[in-house]
Amino acid sequence: MAECFRLVLIGKMATGKKKIMIVAGEASGDLHGSRVVEALTRLNPELHVYGVGSERLRRAGAEMIADSSELSVVGITEVFARMGNLLEAYWQVKKFIQRSGLSLLILIDFPDFNLLLARAANGVGVPILYYISPQVWAWRSGRVKTIARRVKKIAVIFSFEVSIYKNAGLDVEFVGHPLLDLLGSNQQDLYIHEKMEGDPLVALLPGSRPGEVQRLLPEMVQAAKILTAAKPGARFILPMAPTVKVQELEKFLPHDSVPISVVEGKTYEALMAADLAVVASGTATLETAILGKPMVIAYRVSPLSYWVGRAMVKVDWVGLVNIVAGRKVVPELLQGEARGERIAAEVLRILDDEPYRKEMLGGLAEVREKLGTPGAAERVARMALEMIRNKG
């Protein structure tokens, strides 16, 4: 466990520079955080940025304090299984915050972990910018009061979140959804499309957490087998999340005639090339929607996690696409419904039923409109620099 985290030696810290720490606990946060780091260092090359995240933050230029790849979990029982890792990371990062003389702490999503860090930062007078806020509109709305006490400013990615935080007295700004920033940099890469052109292509996105992959990928593979029998020309592409090891995928993949190609680091290219996607619930549903691809949402957690979630969650849908739309735009297969036969049936309906597919595409266009305009990372970076200037 200890090798997952690396505390920077205090004596080697950057001196004479403004210092920012950015904390991202999951693959999506690592991605969006990396864009903020790039914008920050472009706008102010004199900044020194520390990071808690994974490979993308590192590549963007952050000096890594801890690797978050072992922290990402989904569900109540999964949290208990990783509690040792979470606590080890928390104590090390807290210690760093207390000693480092940060000018600003930027927190990205990952609320239970990050709100604890926020309290530690409050104790040493480090201002906090929260980017991609906790989904208080879905569950545990009482966290709004905690956020209002601990966070100086919040950058939200859904327009309907503004009123929630304003009513709590928070300084809040809608910056647009960060996924919109990714379109221009990915649309020109046609390698996968040229490779697969002419065949029905289905993207399989089983999630960015090991637990998700373990529960969903076997059912997606079973669906692929059924679809191959129904559509002999069908092909499948599985973009691998950076937080998932290839060994975790290989044990679930068939070694027979089902044509599943695994690619690394090309999620958006894979989605652009695909005719549709089977997607684990979460941010990936919005990625798929922004790229205008029909989808089937599959969702599985432990029975206890699901039971607790259903008792606490206040929204009607699991998928962010449907939540943003305020209605059912794409099908959701939850728990026992997320099995190969049902997934295959929904995929076939999208492929074969043109009116149904067109109606879904219209709904996805509405969702994209509600997500704002590109430039979220730049806006967040400018907010951060303004907060540092105001701090003095």
Regions found by a protein language model. Give the residues of each.
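Nucleotide-activated sugar donor-binding and catalytic core shared by glycosyltransferases
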Residues: 3-4, 9-392
